[in-house]
Amino acid sequence: MSFMDQIPGGGNYPKLPVECLPNFPIQPSLTFRGRNDSHKLKNFISEIMLNMSMISWPNDASRIVYCRRHLLNPAAQWANDFVQEQGILEITFDTFIQGLYQHFYKPPDINKIFNAITQLSEAKLGIERLNQRFRKIWDRMPPDFMTEKAAIMTYTRLLTKETYNIVRMHKPETLKDAMEEAYQTTALTERFFPGFELDADGDTIIGATTHLQEEYDSDYDSEDNLTQNRYVHTVRTRRSYNKPMSNHRNRRNNNASREECIKNRLCFYCKKEGHRLNECRARKAVLTDLELESKDQQTLFIKTLPIVHYIAIPEMDNTAEKTIKIQNTKVKTLFDSGSPTSFIRRDIVELLKYEIYETPPLRFRGFVATKSAVTSEAVTIDLKINDLQITLAAYILDNMDYQLLIGNPILRRYPKILHTVLNTRESPDSLKPKTYRSETVNNVRTYSAGNRGNPRNIKLSFAPTILEATDPKSAGNRGNPRNTKLSLAPTILEATDPKSAGNRGDSRTKTLSLATTTPAAIDPLTTLDNPGSTQSTFAQFPIPEEASILEEDGKYSNVVSTIQSVEPNATDHSNKDTFCTLPVWLQQKYREIIRNDLPPRPADINNIPVKHDIEIKPGARLPRLQPYHVTEKNEQEINKIVQKLLDNKFIVPSKSPCSSPVVLVPKKDGTFRLCVDYRTLNKATISDPFPLPRIDNLLSRIGNAQIFTTLDLHSGYHQIPMEPKDRYKTAFVTPSGKYEYTVMPFGLVNAPSTFARYMADTFRDLRFVNVYLDDILIFSESPEEHWKHLDTVLERLKNENLIVKKKKCKFASEETEFLGYSIGIQKIAPLQHKCAAIRDFPTPKTVKQAQRFLGMINYYRRFIPNCSKIAQPIQLFICDKSQWTEKQDKAIEKLKAALCNSPVLVPFNNKANYRLTTDASKDGIGAVLEEVDNKNKLVGVVGYFSKSLESAQKNYPAGELELLGIIKALHHFRYMLHGKHFTLRTDHISLLSLQNKNEPARRVQRWLDDLATYDFTLEYLAGPKNVVADAISRAIYTITPETSRPIDTESWKSYYKSDPLCSAVLIHMKELTQHNVTPEDMSAFRSYQKKLELSETFRKNYSLEDEMIYYQDRLVVPIKQQNAVMRLYHDHTLFGGHFGVTVTLAKISPIYYWPKLQHSIIQYIRTCVQCQLIKSHRPRLHGLLQPLPIAEGRWLDISMDFVTGLPPTSNNLNMILVVVDRFSKRAHFIATRKTLDATQLIDLLFRYIFSYHGFPRTITSDRDVRMTADKYQELTKRLGIKSTMSSANHPQTDGQSERTIQTLNRLLRAYVSTNIQNWHVYLPQIEFVYNSTPTRTLGKSPFEIDLGYLPNTPAIKSDDEVNARSFTAVELAKHLKALTIQTKEQLEHAQIEMETNNNQRRKPLLLNIGDHVLVHRDAYFKKGAYMKVQQIYVGPFRVVKKINDNAYELDLNSHKKKHRVINVQFLKSLYTVQTRTQRINQSAPLRELREHTKLLHS
């Protein structure tokens, strides 16, 4: 078989020479099927061209054959046909590729591309993933569709505001430049935020802790005997400052060097002539934007962090001074290893003409300074000391004794500097170790950790000592340090502490060994932002007031400070070695497994019984991914980490078919962590869930422990081997190679389960150990017991070859940290620095920020009484049920205050006595578990519990609600109380007899069964005594209805002077000589004065009667009383009703006036909270409007309907009968019951309607069973009343009643929302408000249309204003006749206008008798099962009668109670061809019953 015959779908090619048949293997990943995917087509062509460019081809035919071998059907079939038609020896390779492209290329959908781009953002994805996805999507864009500038604009809109500002400042010319600038900016921010300082090289900003890492990488920091504690400041500043600081010189000199700018007199920033850097407008504009953007960001604060002093020169002085030359200028320089950074004086900067660049404000204070200073400018300096070339960055100061100060970062990076400077300054004798005479210092103050403000008298005796130190630079490797001997003093302190002797006056002498606790070095900075919250980390170490130490040469060295204050309970970063406090036999026995470094993978690691395996789901694909794009700098970091892993034998080079990419994640200390992206592998892995222990359960086991040890395994995952057969699955790729793990890596989905199971199996039988992954807590009640416990645990770790990280452990202490808690003797408390983080958490602005805050709070919720109740407003905001208001702000403050007030809980002790107190209310349930002694006195609180109620639970009776609270509390504390006797206290006495109840409800019976599993004594606690649980569960909210007193117009006179209009009118009338108009109203006052002088019409409108100002017979309302008037006519329970703008304006405008009256009402109603709560959007009506005939007179045509869904009253009233006169719109609201039948309905009509208004001609209603009853129909016939009923499912026929019911429902919500059980009491008031309110159609109230006058209202306290009118009989008849004519005209006009407006966009449906139609399923049938998949229309049915243009009677089954008249909105014409029409006529139409059954039972 020839080569061409082996090609799938081929075999018909002409015979080729041997040189045309290449022997290159097919790459499976490089294939194309031809699925009209333009992106894949482009990638395929690019890849195939790239591969072919590396091979020498004899002719185009061989290239075509090679390309054809990578095509799959249908692309392969196309290639066969194309080559067969053209001839393989006749066509060129370019023609083949062009034909492939033209055949399978499909123009991309621009809208889809843009939609995909709008889904991206830096905030969601991060800058690396954003760049990757944006480039992938953008490559699908047609080449000439958008310019490069438009591409940059599209990309930058996806960045965060901070990144966008920096990228804009760089002014990128290409999309690639913009993406690179954004990546570099964000990488710097993520790496060094929140702390940073100037790098010693002066080109970048680095984290303050970056300097520490260089020293922590070596072994000498673990030798605490030689460690001196130094402190360096970090400045945490606004995020916006972190971005623009990267490499100032390089960034500003992209096109021109510094020398070229100086030579050509160019600006260092914009590279233009005519100005200097400090005059550059472009630079000022950018800095101004950044400054404004950062004003609302986080404020500056200074925080102390410990570092380790460079111990290779421990015998040298801390400072040295020397004059050095910079640019041939002598500069007086101070070398100070105690300074956290470098400084330079401003006059030297100006003399040397250094370029100044902006920095975040640095706040500092020296040794003896009483005030702090701030600087925000820095320069980069190049200098040479002997043969050492140094580049450093220094802050600029206006006043300083020295011209240049070189600080600790440079001296640590270049340790030879101090050697060089000191050797030229002092004789060799001066470099000898200084010794101290044995002296005594009196009157020394000591601050203990627990009581900083209590001084103690201590005598100090000093004597020299010799200590052994480890010099890391002299060690050949990490495991073979070289010992050197250094002289240090002092070492022994004899302390006399009168306080420890009690009040007897005798003293006890304490000896403190400084071999294990070295005094902190002098710190040049003082904590400024929170000085009162710090305390000593070294208990009982002396701080002399004016102490001095006598040196050999007779000089005194002033001691300024010997203790550095740090945050209380903060993590001890000084690596204080507590391992040496253990007994010597323990230290010697376990020194091999307690270390700071992780030794290489032992050869016998495979002997460990636990191995991690990876089981793949059937049919799942393993990852085969390319490495991510990384910068050159990040690639170097990756290579360093990979090399270290190779040296430790944790990874080996791999030839695995799998590959996962890697990413670098910055740590807090400035270093990086290598993370493998195993997401694809994890999706294909069968999960192996293993439950982690509950933290509450772990803490409950501590009991009466007095001494604690915490252990932290050193890279615990890397101490578990991989199953050899599964190692290839862990393969990862870097830009330089592929590797696979021999140990369990981080990031695998089942890695936590494997490790947790391993640790649980190792320590399952030990009750004095708590294990949570690699965190181990050992607790004991005495030191002797603790040594045994510690020996047991360490022995097991040693047997399992598990290494413990020494500097992360804390041995044999009375207080320690474990899983975010501070644990001590009879104490469990939250960590203070965690509480400080919560306290400093900014007010959330988004849902995610609120969720993040609640997540932090929920971890410590056991310390917060009433936590769920306090957090409820925040939860409502997260659920989008509330806006962020003052309630949420108060909840935030309450939660912060509750957590930051040092809450302390006592650990659970199985031998102690406990008392559970519960309470419940309609708002929630709460409980508190307390420990009590034998006399029932409180020892401490073990924990709090609170929970909100669900809507159904709020309806439980009081007894069941209390029982529910008990059950929930017992379930919460079950792990402590189950199987133990305790006291259960409740303030609901009915619970005491629940267990004796004969036949309780099923729910209660189930709860009682749960109670039976506990051993408790039920105790009644009177409500006033149940303070704690009551506070947790109860919160009282009262809402009072809006009321207002009658308006006293006489009081308005006192406001005339301050009102601009009234004062202008009175001054013009010479009734007032001076005014009190406020400055903000002066412009309006002058405008009114001008109008009064120039316009006679304007003047005539105003008059003065009884010292009251009138505008056209309407009272003028001062500004300060306008809200009172609007409140009366809008909010009042009797005169208001919370109507809209039109109605409220109609109420106010006939009586009162002020400028912009309508605008004021609009604004008032728009901001009315009650209106926003109760009013709903009124949807547009559908279908043609066929109005009813206009009513001829009062109460001749009425409509009626029922309002249901009301809560039953004390009289069992639960429905309202609404009767409306269609002429005057007057209504009666009659309270009744749902059980009302036709006979009772007739009785109500006689008692409330017919007896007052006579018998109507027509009654319009819906098809309620009461109206369709035989008795009702017989009555209306005998009385000559025509009963008009709406068609099925079309309540719009009785539109008058429906509209009235809408208004009635809104009034009910406004009046009775706080007292829903008594709605019938408010019904007469609501009826009066409704009938006295003018309607929009008629312009008058129903009262006036019906009676001819307005009823008197007591809203106005004035004898002159009377609303009710007095008529004679003749006048009343004339007035009523005029009203009747006017009302008819207005009704006709409104009807025509309404019909025109509603029918503009409607199309009538005209049917003839005999036509066939389809009926919508909602017209007759109730919703059944699976309605989403049922047909929308049923039928066809035949039209048998036309009622009007809007309703037709259909040929439906007559046995149904519902009417066969259907509104046209539920009908649809059936369009058929002739043959189908004949078939329909020949057979009977589908019947209603069959369709009903099909819908309900399908």
UniProtKB/Swiss-Prot annotation:
SMART domains per record: ZnF_C2HC
Site for Cleavage, residues: 207-208, 233-234, 309-310, 442-443, 561-562, 1037-1038, 1063-1064
Free-text comment on this protein's domains from its UniProt entry: Integrase core domain contains the D-x(n)-D-x(35)-E motif, named for the phylogenetically conserved glutamic acid and aspartic acid residues and the invariant 35 amino acid spacing between the second and third acidic residues. Each acidic residue of the D,D(35)E motif is independently essential for the 3'-processing and strand transfer activities of purified integrase protein.
Localization of this protein: Cytoplasm; Nucleus
Binding of Mg(2+) 1, residues: 712, 774-775
Ranges where the record places region Integrase-type zinc finger-like: 1132-1171
Top-level taxon in the UniProt lineage: Eukaryota
PROSITE patterns the UniProt entry points to: INTEGRASE (PS50994), RT_POL (PS50878), ZF_CCHC (PS50158)
Alphabetized GO MF terms: aspartic-type endopeptidase activity; ATP binding; DNA binding; DNA-directed DNA polymerase activity; RNA binding; RNA-directed DNA polymerase activity; RNA-DNA hybrid ribonuclease activity; zinc ion binding
Region (Disordered): 470-490
EC annotation from Swiss-Prot or TrEMBL: 3.4.23.-, 2.7.7.49, 2.7.7.7, 3.1.26.4
PANTHER family assigned to the protein according to its UniProt record, in alphabetical order: PROTEIN CBG26694, PROTEIN NYNRIN-LIKE
Gene Ontology biological process terms, A to Z: DNA integration; DNA recombination; proteolysis; viral translational frameshifting
CDD domains (UniProt xref): retropepsin_like, RNase_HI_RT_Ty3, RT_LTR
Listed Pfam families: Integrase_H2C2, Peptidase_A2B, RT_RNaseH_2, rve, RVT_1, SH3_Tf2-1, Ty3_capsid
Record keywords: Aspartyl protease, ATP-binding, Cytoplasm, DNA integration, DNA recombination, DNA-binding, DNA-directed DNA polymerase, Endonuclease, Hydrolase, Magnesium, Metal-binding, Multifunctional enzyme, Nuclease, Nucleotide-binding, Nucleotidyltransferase, Nucleus, Protease, RNA-binding, RNA-directed DNA polymerase, Transferase, Transposable element, Viral release from host cell, Virion maturation, Zinc, Zinc-finger
Binding site for Mg(2+) 2: 1201, 1262
Zinc finger (CCHC-type) in chain: 265-282
Quaternary organization: The protease is a homodimer, whose active site consists of two apposed aspartic acid residues.
Catalytic reactions on record: DNA(n) + a 2'-deoxyribonucleoside 5'-triphosphate = DNA(n+1) + diphosphate; Endonucleolytic cleavage to 5'-phosphomonoester
Protein name (database record): Transposon Ty3-I Gag-Pol polyprotein
Post-translational modification: Initially, virus-like particles (VLPs) are composed of the structural unprocessed proteins Gag and Gag-Pol, and also contain the host initiator methionine tRNA (tRNA(i)-Met) which serves as a primer for minus-strand DNA synthesis, and a dimer of genomic Ty RNA. Processing of the polyproteins occurs within the particle and proceeds by an ordered pathway, called maturation.
Active site, renumbered: 336
Signal peptide: none
Location of the RNase H Ty3/gyspy-type domain: 919-1037
